[in-house]
Amino acid sequence: MTTQRKPYVRTMTPTWWQKLGFYRFYMLREGTSVPAVWFSIVLIYGVFALKGGVDSWAGFVGFLQNPLVLLINFVALLAALLHTKTWFDLAPKAANIVVNSEKMGPGPIVKTLWAVTVVASVVILAVALV
């Protein structure tokens, strides 16, 4: 015997995520993937320009000096920093580190991750500029 009752289907508007700050921030964080794709494409373009020789590399550097490209790269940098911050804030929740029978707080883990990021960035810049 089947029932004639219709199931309740809750309506969902396309802007449902705009009502709560948590969801807006989630969508912003997920949106950081778009600038990451831009950065990846520019990086691949740079590798092929480097392989192509001096003229190709000069064209790539000229492309990077375009004000619109500089603006997009700045937005990509901000997006990468936001994404990094959210992942570093998430890392202590996944790690259960116990020191002297007490669970370590998130502060030292996050600070260590940022310190490693800064040191790695400085080393990469030093190698690139020498």
UniProtKB/Swiss-Prot annotation:
Nucleotide-binding as UniProt keyword: no
CDD domains associated with the record: QFR_TypeD_subunitC
Alphabetized GO MF terms: succinate dehydrogenase activity
Main location: membrane
Highest taxon of source: Bacteria
One GO cellular component term noted in the UniProt record for this chain: fumarate reductase complex
Topology relative to the membrane: Multi-pass membrane protein
Compartments it resides in: Cell inner membrane
One Pfam entry name: Fumarate_red_C
Keywords (A to Z) from UniProt: Cell inner membrane, Cell membrane, Membrane, Transmembrane, Transmembrane helix
Record keyword Transmembrane present: yes
Membrane-spanning ranges: 34-54, 60-80, 109-129
Protein family membership: Belongs to the FrdC family.
Assembly notes: Part of an enzyme complex containing four subunits: a flavoprotein (FrdA), an iron-sulfur protein (FrdB), and two hydrophobic anchor proteins (FrdC and FrdD).
Function as written in the Swiss-Prot or TrEMBL entry: Two distinct, membrane-bound, FAD-containing enzymes are responsible for the catalysis of fumarate and succinate interconversion; fumarate reductase is used in anaerobic growth, and succinate dehydrogenase is used in aerobic growth. Anchors the catalytic components of the fumarate reductase complex to the cell inner membrane, binds quinones.
Annotated protein name in UniProt: Fumarate reductase subunit C
